[in-house]
């Protein structure tokens, strides 16, 4: 217990020091004035409610915060017709307020991680584990295309899948234990993911491979708290799917993991780590597209860092898009509002370089420009 607390204090101290030391040169007022209205585009946010009507908090997200996108969960979904009405309203309202398309994201991996499931009237789907064990790439592409069609018809345009964590640790509770890995062979994982992405693209759905640099080795769950993979990680195995898929140009976005590996960064978990994101993912593997964080409300982050400081550190590390799965905080507070305040302060004071923010916004804009699901859902 004492060791865990000491480690948490060290990590929190490292975050505070690194954010403070990032640079003290304030951005020019004119440049900040140009950036400020767009800083909400660095956010992908989950909300409460199943309709836009009488939902002031949701309207603020779309028209005041001006988020790049929203993410749907079971709490937002009743059935297919309601979901289509909701997404149609979301996309229309966002475009009316901002003139830009809205990312409408969901976790629809298949199997147990499937927000559009039988309970809401959709048919059952196969998990990554099911598909990997079957070993039929044509079946994987067909199943992904079927899931993608479900998303398209519901007005969803971004699936935060596939999982390309290599499942070589049978004791892993959050990936292997719930059927979220295609398998223990990294080349098989890459092949299955390639087919899965092809199916999604055929349905007009964007994807995100996850969880970089690998969550398949852990013995803990980053949803619940701090996860240290220093002694279990195998980068020679876990980075293979990324290396192969990124080189082929089939990846739309990469999602990070909140895992700590002192061999990559002795101070902070991957999402907050510049050596991991900017160093390994961007410099070594050559990724130039969008990097989206995993949920910043997860225990691995929220239990150790303030939401705003963590978001600033993630952006400094090379993350482009900050995922906040639940915007509602105790006391009628907004996680996205507090995060945006911290980002604005960091940009204004020069702690988050304006040039880096502009690059992130450009990558996000390029991703949004590829959306193919129209506001009028078929």
Q: Could you describe each region identified by the protein language model?
A:
Residues 8-20:
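Bacterial N-terminal signal peptides
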Residues 24-118, 322-324, 366:
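N-terminal hydrophobic targeting/anchoring segments and the immediately downstream early-domain regions
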Residues 41-46, 68-73, 102-106, 112, ...:
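Structural recognition of the beta-strand scaffold that forms the well-ordered cores
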Residues 53-54, 78-95, 188-352:
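Second-shell residues forming the walls of enzyme active-site clefts
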Residues 91-123, 140-167, 189-213:
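Glycine-rich, aromatic-flanked loop segments that form ligand/cofactor-binding clefts
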Residues 121-135, 179-183:
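A charged helix-plus-loop insertion that forms the helical arch/lid used to bind
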Residues 158-183, 203-207, 211-227:
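Short glycine/serine-rich loop/turn segments
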Residues 347-377:
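Mid-to-C-terminal alpha-helical segments outside catalytic/metal-binding sites
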């Amino acid at each position: 217990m004492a060791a865990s607390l000491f480690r948490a204090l060290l990590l929190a101290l490292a975050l505070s020091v690194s954010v403070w030391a990032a640079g003290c040169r304030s951005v020019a007022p004119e440049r900040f004035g140009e950036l400020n209205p767009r800083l909400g585009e660095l956010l992908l946010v989950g909300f409460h409610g199943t309709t836009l009507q009488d939902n002031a908090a949701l309207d603020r997200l779309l028209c005041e915060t001006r988020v790049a996108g929203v993410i749907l969960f079971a709490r937002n979904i009743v059935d297919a017709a309601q979901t289509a009405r909701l997404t149609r309203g979301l996309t229309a309202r966002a475009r009316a307020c901002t003139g830009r398309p809205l990312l409408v994201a969901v976790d629809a991996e298949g199997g147990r991680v499937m927000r559009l499931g039988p309970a809401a009237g959709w048919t059952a789907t196969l998990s990554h584990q099911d598909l990997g064990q079957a070993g039929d790439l044509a079946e994987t592409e067909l199943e992904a295309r079927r899931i993608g069609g479900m998303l398209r018809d519901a007005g969803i345009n971004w699936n935060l899948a596939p999982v390309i964590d290599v499942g070589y640790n049978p004791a892993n509770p959050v990936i292997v234990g719930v059927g979220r890995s295609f398998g223990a062979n990294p080349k098989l994982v890459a092949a299955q993911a390639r087919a899965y992405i092809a199916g999604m693209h055929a349905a007009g759905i964007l994807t995100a491979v996850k969880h970089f640099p690998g969550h398949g080795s852990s013995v803990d769950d980053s949803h619940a708290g701090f996860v240290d993979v220093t002694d279990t990680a195998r980068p020679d195995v876990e980075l293979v799917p990324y290396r192969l898929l990124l080189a082929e140009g089939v990846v739309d976005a990469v999602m990070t993991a909140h895992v700590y590996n002192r061999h990559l960064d002795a101070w902070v978990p991957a999402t907050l780590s510049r050596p991991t994101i900017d160093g390994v993912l961007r410099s070594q593997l050559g990724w130039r597209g969008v990097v989206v964080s995993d949920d910043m409300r997860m225990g691995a982050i929220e239990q150790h860092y303030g939401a705003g400081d963590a978001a600033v550190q993630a952006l400094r590390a090379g993350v482009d898009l900050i995922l906040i799965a639940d915007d509602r905080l105790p006391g009628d507070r907004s996680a996205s509002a507090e995060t945006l305040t911290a980002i604005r302060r960091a940009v204004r004071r020069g702690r988050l370089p304006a040039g880096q923010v502009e690059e992130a916004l450009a990558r996000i804009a390029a991703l949004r420009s590829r959306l193919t699901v129209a506001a009028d859902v078929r």
